[in-house]
């Protein structure tokens, strides 16, 4: 489970 980009993208929301 490695959500690097997702974490950043979701972080904006």
From Swiss-Prot:
Q: Where mainly located?
A: secreted
Q: Which residues does this entry mark as bearing Phenylalanine amide?
A: 13
Q: Which residues carry this modification: Pyrrolidone carboxylic acid?
A: 1
Which cell locations does it reside in?
Answer: Secreted
Q: In which tissues is it expressed?
A: Expressed by the venom gland.
Recorded GO CC terms: extracellular region
Q: Which UniProt keywords apply?
A: Amidation, Pyrrolidone carboxylic acid, Secreted
Family to which this protein belongs: Belongs to the tachykinin family.
Protein name as annotated = Tachykinin-like peptide-XII
